[in-house]
Amino acid sequence: MTEQQFKYRVVFFQQPGCVACNAMKPIWAETANELAEETPYYKIGFGEWDVTSDNWEFCDQINCDGTPNFAVFNEDCELIGLNTDGILAKTQLKDFITKSIESSNK
């Protein structure tokens, strides 16, 4: 799937050396793979953002105040979901992503 085909984008905000971010990476990868397989109709693109790459500027724009955190954007790059709770269980992360998408479709 090319970038133009994504209807939603989910971003994992992380930073190098963050112990919690490193603990979250396997959960993030597993969740992304499962959602891509289970919900292809959502056309979700998954990516990571190193918050140190722009000195937290992007995070400040969307009120993302720490790591690890997650955001969901629609195809117009509008923020439709922001989770700043840090480490999540896989079911919590999946629920956050799907609820963000479903609530934007109402």
List each model region and its residues:
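Short active-site neighborhood of thiol/selenol oxidoreductases, capturing the structured segment around
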Residues: 3-16
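Core residues of folded domains in eukaryotic genome-function proteins
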Residues: 6-9, 42, 66
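Short, structured motif recognition centered on aromatic/hydrophobic residues
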Residues: 10-13, 28, 70, 74
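Thiol-based oxidoreductase modules, predominantly thioredoxin-like and allied folds used
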Residues: 13-14, 22, 32, 37-56
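The canonical Cys-X-X-Cys-His
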Residues: 18-21, 70
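Cys/His-rich microdomains that often coordinate metals
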Residues: 25
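A short glycine-leucine-enriched loop at secondary-structure breakpoints
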Residues: 60-65
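Non-catalytic, surface beta->alpha helical segment in thiol-disulfide oxidoreductase systems
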Residues: 66-106
